[in-house]
């Protein structure tokens, strides 16, 4: 057996997103304040920091103001403050603008900024490195390391140079062990190691199941005459019907570009729904098509998001580490924001870890982190909106949204609801194919609407082809023998990258094909597969999308 080299750190962080980078920065800040020399490294599976980051994004700067008060001096996010905030309710041909006074003040986007979250993370990485943080892009954390007492003591990166059949190629290199006094998992939504941590330590015992949405995003260069920097629009209603929930966004950002996208909540019941196709159909609405006329699509991507809110947040700590950011699920769905809460979670965990290490502790539970969360503005913010998502799911888009609005207003005025509604797993919601009708989707015209393969091309996705398939099946027979007759194999449609296909059905010999090289790491298959037969694991580090400005 090949021996792996090891490197010791005080803290190891898995994932260079906003939570992981904020944790690293705050950890070094606290160490400097106490006159201590503490070490921290950040592992990032993307080819560079930001390569796998995708968001709208409209960002509340509250955590940035706390972490780096002078951020406006040189951060690219500061270029475009939000100047206008609109909410459209769509029918197939028309829109209704929701009156501003109908929504609570915390939904108004006052003082926020719109821009690329990937570029914000690149900027944060630079600030982290200035403080002495070591960042390793292109290294995927593939294994959790446990000590003899079962406590987490770090992670190991994946082996490189392994062929599809599992044999070692000529360029084989074993993974590297990174040992830590505390390990933070900041993998984002549905992290594969986070799943193992939650299962191993039963962290979800007292929380609801996490629930999810799939965001499909495009970046467009539009007609300069139509561009209004700082204009932010959210939509609800069409094209989704009674069997699905979600909504769209249009953000006028820097350089004449518009970020647009559509989130489909993954509790939908019709197995013929395609979140990718819903987004393409949404663009054909007259108001949206007019904005994009004469423009050009320049980038594409997709990513699942955690929608469960407060009641789905698991226990945040375990012996030897913590969950931060969207690994835990701090997204505020009604505000359509999670960057500020993710950053704050990382900062709170970092402060707890620094204090513990300076007190000569290691590998125990950082109880100060959940205590800080309980006393923080993050928990208060999430508590106010905790019933919004379940109300919309239970009562539908319009009645549910109305009831949700009432609860938010009451909570805003301090009238706390005496109940918290429950969530149910997204993979349990599909109906049999014979009980539903397939939606009608537009044929791609290559100008306004597109197919999945040409879209994946714009994500700059690349994987080493001669490596083990990272989309694993617990039982290879299930897709054809169960999912196909029951649901017409929904993986063909819920995947936004064309990874899954059924071929040979026309000659009576159906076969399930996995085009793993197309995978944009959205994690939807791991979430929505009705039998939970698909398990997403990391491919070689550096593989996946390379989002330049998303």
Predicted regions and their residues:
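Beta1/beta-strand and adjacent pyrophosphate-binding region of the FAD-binding site
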Residues: 4-19, 41
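Predominantly flavin-linked oxidoreductase catalytic cores and closely associated redox partners
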Residues: 118, 122-123, 127-288, 348, ...
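Active-site-proximal substrate-binding core of FAD-dependent oxidoreductases
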Residues: 329-335, 347, 351-396, 513-515, ...
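N-terminal FAD cofactor-binding segment of flavoenzymes
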Residues: 45-94
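Glycine-rich FAD pyrophosphate-binding loop
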Residues: 28-53
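C-terminal auxiliary extensions adjacent to catalytic cores
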Residues: 392-447
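Iron-sulfur cluster-binding cysteine motifs and their immediate structural context
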Residues: 485-516, 523-546
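FAD-binding beta-loop-beta segment adjacent to the flavin cofactor pocket
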Residues: 302-333, 455-466, 479-494, 501
């Amino acid at each position: 057996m090949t021996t792996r080299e090891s490197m010791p750190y005080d803290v190891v962080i898995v994932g260079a997103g906003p939570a992981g980078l904020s944790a690293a920065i705050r950890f070094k800040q606290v160490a400097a304040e106490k006159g201590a020399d503490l070490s921290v490294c950040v592992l990032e599976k993307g080819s560079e920091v930001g390569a796998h980051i995708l968001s709208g994004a409209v960002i509340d700067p509250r955590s940035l103001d706390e972490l780096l008060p002078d951020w406006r001096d040189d951060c690219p996010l500061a270029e475009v403050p939000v100047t206008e905030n609109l909410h459209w309710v769509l029918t197939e041909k028309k829109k209704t603008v929701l009156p501003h006074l109908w929504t609570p003040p915390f939904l108004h986007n006052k003082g926020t900024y719109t821009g690329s979250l990937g570029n914000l993370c690149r900027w944060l990485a630079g600030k982290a490195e200035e403080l002495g943080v070591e960042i390793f892009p292109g290294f995927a954390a593939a294994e959790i390391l446990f000590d003899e007492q079962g406590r987490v003591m770090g992670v190991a990166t994946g082996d490189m140079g392994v062929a599809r059949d599992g044999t070692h190629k000529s360029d084989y290199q074993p993974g590297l062990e990174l040992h830590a006094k505390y390990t933070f998992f900041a993998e984002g939504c549905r992290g594969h190691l986070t799943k193992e941590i939650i299962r191993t330590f039963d962290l979800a015992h007292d929380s609801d199941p996490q629930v999810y949405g799939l965001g499909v995003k495009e970046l467009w260069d539009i007609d300069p005459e139509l561009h209004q920097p700082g204009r932010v629009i959210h939509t609800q209603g069409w094209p989704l019907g009674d069997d699905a929930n979600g909504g769209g966004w249009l953000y006028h950002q820097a350089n004449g570009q518009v970020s647009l996208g559509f989130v489909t909540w993954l509790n939908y019941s019709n197995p013929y729904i395609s979140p990718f196709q819903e987004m393409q159909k949404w663009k054909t609405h007259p108001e949206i098509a007019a904005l994009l006329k004469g423009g050009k699509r320049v980038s594409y991507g997709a990513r699942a998001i955690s929608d469960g809110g407060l009641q789905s947040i698991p226990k945040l700590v375990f012996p030897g580490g913590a969950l931060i950011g969207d690994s835990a699920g701090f997204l505020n769905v009604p505000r359509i924001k999670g960057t500020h809460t993710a950053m704050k979670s990382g900062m709170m965990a970092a402060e707890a870890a620094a204090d513990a290490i300076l007190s000569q502790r290691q590998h125990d539970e950082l109880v100060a982190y959940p205590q800080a969360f309980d006393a923080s503005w993050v928990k208060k913010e999430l508590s106010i909106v905790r019933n919004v998502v379940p109300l919309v799911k239970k009562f539908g888009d319009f009645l549910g949204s109305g009831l949700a609005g009432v609860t938010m207003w009451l909570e805003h005025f301090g009238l706390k609801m005496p109940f918290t509604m429950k969530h149910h797993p997204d993979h349990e919601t599909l109906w049999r194919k014979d009980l539903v009708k397939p939606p009608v989707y537009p044929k791609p015209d290559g100008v306004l609407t597109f197919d999945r393969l040409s879209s994946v091309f714009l994500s700059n996705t690349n994987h080493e082809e001669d490596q083990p398939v990272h989309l694993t099946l617990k039982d290879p027979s299930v897709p054809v023998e169960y999912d196909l007759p029951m649901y017409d194999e929904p993986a063909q449609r819920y995947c936004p990258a064309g990874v899954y296909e059924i071929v040979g059905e026309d000659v009576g010999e159906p076969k399930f094909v996995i085009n793993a090289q197309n995978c944009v790491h959205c994690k939807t298959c791991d979430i929505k597969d009705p039998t939970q037969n698909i398990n997403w694991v990391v491919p070689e580090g550096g593989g996946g999308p390379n989002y330049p400005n998303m």
